[in-house]
Amino acid sequence: ISSVAERTEDSPDVKPYTQETNTEWISVELPPEMKAIQTLLKLSLDERYDTLRKNGIRLAEQQSLSALLRIRQFVLNQNRRSAKPLFTAIRIHYALNILEAHGITSFLKFCERAKIKKGAGVKELFDVDPNFTRAIHLAKDAQSKGIEHSKILKLKEIVESVPGKALIFTSYRDSVDVIFNKLTEMGISAGILIGKSGETGLKQKKQIETVQNFREGLFRVLVATRVGEEGLDISEVNQVIFYDNVPSSIRYIQRRGRTGRKDIGKLVVLIAKNTIDETYYWIGKRKMTAAKSMGDKMTKVLQKNQEIESQKTGLDAFL
């Protein structure tokens, strides 16, 4: 590589073709019912961490899901007695993340699927563990009362604050249905755009039809999973809403790029306080900063190498 070309939104040859995108970060508090469930799940998780530490596994005080996933192979190969608490901890961590970012219904649907799968610790977790079983009981009680994530209550206010079309992104399939149903109940016309996998997935023909209907204004809001981030030709939207955060700078840019093409756009990012949302926010922020500085660093290295090459004389110049 002899040179690197870097472009940002402010580059002279790019700026004429883009519009400003105003970004708003909105923090919400989990409802008390969800906080109670969150506490129980963390207690259940801590029990597994204690067992893993007693078995000689080194864990940080605040253990991430990705860190747990990384030690799976080590446990299977060299510390088999830790397999059950580790895989149970991973299941609990997934459940906790889904609760925090997506809400009651998505959490319960995840638990329903996890319970019927065979695996180490499944029966103990769902039938014996007092904290986890209590968490599920509280979640079902909250669901029966119509309690969902606080983000849902914010959506109507956000969507109606900007006239025109809105695109809502969520990483989790189950929350697409929750968001769609709640918007419909609120009297907001909406459509769904999801991937092709699974029994409930949309085939490509249906995806294209959904996008076309959105473009023609048959509904005002499109709720999409990752399939809406790239590839499909979704028309210009006035507002993009991140229902959840993604720790990927590439996916952040792809989501954000759906607005602010022809006119000034708006991006709204919903963050639940003291949850995985905040963690992903900071991870994403660091990655964005790193990505912006990468081009400059590479250019400086290449310039330095070129200077060294130009200074070579004599025999060195031919080696």
Give the positions of each predicted feature.
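A short beta-strand element within the Helicase C-terminal
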Residues: 223, 230-245, 265-271
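Switch/connector loops and helix/strand junctions flanking conserved nucleotide-binding motifs
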Residues: 12-17, 36-38, 200-201, 231-234, ...
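Conserved helicase ATPase core of P-loop NTP-dependent helicases/translocases
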Residues: 165-169, 175-226
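Short glycine-/polar-rich loops that comprise or flank the Walker A/P-loop
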Residues: 1-3, 21-23, 188-189, 235-238, ...
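Helicase-associated low-complexity regulatory tails and linkers flanking the ATPase motor
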Residues: 289-319
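Helicase motor interdomain insertion/brace
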Residues: 3-15, 33-181, 185
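Short beta-alpha junctions and helix-cap segments that line functional grooves
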Residues: 210, 251-256
